[in-house]
Every structure is written in structure tokens, then in C-alpha cells.
């Protein structure tokens, strides 16, 4: 609990943990669960604990954002890695039609966006069982050009 006391951004999470809130219960009008709060604050240790206690990694809030979206918006590669390793759906779209990858690009976190692009490509290859890695390089280059701050019209439809 000492870590929570050092970070003023997680007062809500601290309260939830102290009161014994369910890991999947939406605690506020925005329908953000404790896992949303942990991912959105970049708190990988609390995210891991919640995932181990059965948190729903794909639960969406009123904006249609899952914890993966929250982690992408704050640039937490550690939280993204935990969520992906726990089989979070990387292709979920929020109400604006944006994936976590799209949000990472638009929020200025290219390392997170490239990570999600690579994971998506690996999942596509695994699903199709065609190990042509050149397709991944082409997709990554395309996303880099679309991911610039200047180009906001290149939104992908889901």
C-alpha cells in the first residue's frame, strides 16, 4: 500500500482495493473497472494482481474503451504487454472506431503502437499459418506514415 500512497493519481484505485470492490465491477458512471484504472495509470503491479484475480480484460467503459485502450493512451508498454500476454483482444474498437494501436499512434507513443502492430501481425500470421514476415514490415511502415500527428484523416474503420 506504500506505493499507492506515493501516487496521487490512484486514490480511486486505493479506495477500491481497501473496500474490497469486485475486480469487474464498474465503480463509477464512466463504467471504469479497477483494471481500467490500473491500466490507465500505468500501474502494472496492480494490473497483474487484478488479472490474477479474474478481471475481465475486455470490459469496455462508456467510451467503448477496454483496459488495452487505457494503457495505450498513457504509453504504458508494461501494461500493454501484460494485457496482450493475458489474451486481451487487440482489435477491440472504442465508440470512435479506434483500436488501442490507433490511440497509441495518435497519443504519440510509437513504441506502444509498433508493439501492438507487431502483435497483431503475429496473430494474423499464426491464424493464417503463412509465415511471410515481409507482410508485417509493410504493415508497420504503413502505420508509421499514418501515425504522424499531421495526418488525422487516416483513421481505420473497424
UniProtKB/Swiss-Prot annotation:
Pfam families registered for this protein in UniProt:
Ank_2
| Superkingdom of source | Eukaryota
The alphabetized UniProt keywords are: ANK repeat, Cytoplasm, Nucleus, Repeat, Ubl conjugation
Localisation per UniProt entry: Nucleus; Cytoplasm
Q: Which InterPro entries match?
A: Ank_Repeat/CDKN_Inhibitor, Ankyrin_rpt, Ankyrin_rpt-contain_sf
Q: Which residues form a coiled coil?
A: none
Q: Which SUPFAM superfamilies match?
A: Ankyrin repeat (SSF48403)
* Primary residence: nucleus
| PTM | Ubiquitinated by the CRL2(FEM1B) complex, leading to its degradation.
Residues in ANK repeats: 1-25, 30-59, 63-92
Organ and tissue specificity: Mainly expressed in testis, small intestine, colon, blood leukocytes and in pancreatic adenocarcinoma cells.
One GO location term (cellular component): cytosol
Question: Motif Nuclear localization signal located where?
Answer: 129-149
Family annotation (PANTHER family): ANK_REP_REGION DOMAIN-CONTAINING PROTEIN, ANKYRIN REPEAT DOMAIN-CONTAINING PROTEIN 37
What is the protein's given name?
Ankyrin repeat domain-containing protein 37
Amino acid at each position: 500500500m506504500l506505493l499507492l500512497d506515493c501516487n496521487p493519481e490512484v486514490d480511486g484505485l486505493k479506495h477500491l482495493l481497501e473496500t474490497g470492490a469486485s475486480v469487474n465491477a464498474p465503480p463509477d458512471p464512466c463504467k471504469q473497472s479497477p483494471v481500467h484504472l490500473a491500466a490507465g495509470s500505468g500501474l502494472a503491479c496492480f494490473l497483474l494482481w487484478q488479472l490474477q484475480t479474474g478481471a475481465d480484460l475486455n470490459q469496455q467503459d462508456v467510451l467503448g474503451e477496454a483496459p488495452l485502450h487505457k494503457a495505450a493512451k498513457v504509453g504504458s508498454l508494461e501494461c500493454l504487454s501484460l494485457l496482450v500476454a493475458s489474451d486481451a483482444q487487440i482489435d477491440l474498437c472504442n465508440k470512435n472506431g479506434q483500436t488501442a494501436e490507433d490511440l497509441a499512434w495518435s497519443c504519440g507513443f510509437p513504441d506502444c503502437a509498433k508493439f501492438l502492430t507487431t502483435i497483431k501481425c503475429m496473430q494474423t500470421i499464426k491464424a493464417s499459418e503463412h509465415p511471410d514476415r515481409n507482410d508485417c514490415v509493410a504493415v508497420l511502415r504503413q502505420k508509421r506514415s499514418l501515425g504522424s500527428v499531421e495526418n488525422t484523416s487516416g483513421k481505420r474503420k473497424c
